[in-house]
């Protein structure tokens, strides 16, 4: 009987031990501690993987604050680690705002102007943001990190990030089907811009390469052995509602999700008197924890504490990350 099965391990140990995983997304409603959780997961992964990259796709770029180190649009080693890297990208930025490293070829003849790429995709509504993600993914795949953790923006941006391979595949597919008709026009266009080294074949090759990478990424995103999503929430109505909506959307997109983190929990000693505010909050969270247990009985549900001090800096994150592996128990 299924009902007699023991509950799943209340930790992220299953993810850390799953060597086949390539992409791990961490997301949820704003203000629930996604960055702390994603940074902590990246730290734990760095103990068992050869190289780990954490990417922030949240415009707030909180991982710089979390690790107390400034990160950029290019992977940078995190202080205090040999194999953990971090980078921040703006999900609202288009191709024109990506750094030159993303567009460099082996020589000048293979270098494709950002301006030309921008002009080409402007005719495809909604693809600019997706193409920005696509260039980032192409760069990241080329660096062969063992696993990539995404610290995502609040839910709306997250769902667009998940869907970007399909958007790019559709858009580039249209361009490539038209490339024979476009070739003379593109040649004239780049000639007018004074870029003799860039021709229609070069642009076409660039798009072909991009499409090949994105098709592979799309396949990997749909493969539960390679991609999974970790939902972070707090024990309150709106956060739980958003989490359920996110789980349903991820399921529609074919993205694996079987881990939920419930963050910022009060762990009260019932044998001692607590302040009335703490007792009230504890009662509320107990109510929603019961609902979470009912809704997600086939999920790994990890419970993390609300701390007196903020989690900031490499050492603080290292310490907090242990709670992802061993269920938290308050000190006696």
From Swiss-Prot:
Chain residues that bind Zn(2+): 275, 278
Domain of life of the organism in this record?
Eukaryota
Tell me the residue numbers annotated for binding ATP.
29-36, 236, 263
Q: Where in the cell is it found?
A: Cytoplasm; Endoplasmic reticulum
Catalytic site? 58
Matches recorded under Pfam families: ArsA_ATPase
Per its UniProt record, what Gene3D superfamilies does this chain match?
A: P-loop containing nucleotide triphosphate hydrolases
Q: What are the boundaries of the signal sequence?
A: none
Top class in the EC scheme? hydrolase
Supply one GO CC term from the record.
GET complex
Q: GO annotations under biological process?
A: tail-anchored membrane protein insertion into ER membrane
The catalytic activity of this protein is classed by the Enzyme Commission as 3.6.-.-
Keywords from the UniProt entry: ATP-binding, Cytoplasm, Endoplasmic reticulum, Hydrolase, Metal-binding, Nucleotide-binding, Transport, Zinc
Q: Which GO terms describe its molecular function?
A: ATP binding; ATP hydrolysis activity; metal ion binding
Q: Write out the similarity annotation.
A: Belongs to the arsA ATPase family.
Q: Give the multimer and partner information.
A: Homodimer.
Biological role stated in the UniProt entry: ATPase required for the post-translational delivery of tail-anchored (TA) proteins to the endoplasmic reticulum. Recognizes and selectively binds the transmembrane domain of TA proteins in the cytosol. This complex then targets to the endoplasmic reticulum by membrane-bound receptors, where the tail-anchored protein is released for insertion. This process is regulated by ATP binding and hydrolysis. ATP binding drives the homodimer towards the closed dimer state, facilitating recognition of newly synthesized TA membrane proteins. ATP hydrolysis is required for insertion.
Q: What is this protein called?
A: ATPase ASNA1 homolog
